[in-house]
């Protein structure tokens, strides 16, 4: 009952396409991808704190 089949996934994609339109979906996916990328960087600890960024610019 908790698993999605191919038919259910296709129906969900069709509804998303109807709601957002073909032009808006690439923008949404780009935003999602950049958000996931930032989250992964933060989880790794690769980001330098703001105070250290200011010191390196000077």
From Swiss-Prot:
Per the record, the coiled-coil ranges are: none
Q: Name one Pfam family in it.
A: TatA_B_E
- Cite the GO molecular-function annotations of the record: protein transmembrane transporter activity
Where in the cell? Cell inner membrane
Return one Gene Ontology term, BP aspect: protein transport by the Tat complex
Question: Origin, by domain of life?
Answer: Bacteria
Q: How does it sit in the membrane?
A: Single-pass membrane protein
Where exactly are the transmembrane stretches of this chain? 4-21
* GO CC terms, sorted: TAT protein transport complex
Q: Which UniProt keywords apply?
A: Cell inner membrane, Cell membrane, Membrane, Protein transport, Translocation, Transmembrane, Transmembrane helix, Transport
Please state the span of the N-terminal signal peptide per the UniProt entry.
none
Protein's job: Part of the twin-arginine translocation (Tat) system that transports large folded proteins containing a characteristic twin-arginine motif in their signal peptide across membranes. TatA could form the protein-conducting channel of the Tat system.
The annotated subunit structure for this chain is:
Forms a complex with TatC.
NCBIfam families per the UniProt record, alphabetical: tatAE
Its family remark reads: Belongs to the TatA/E family.
Protein name per Swiss-Prot or TrEMBL: Sec-independent protein translocase protein TatA
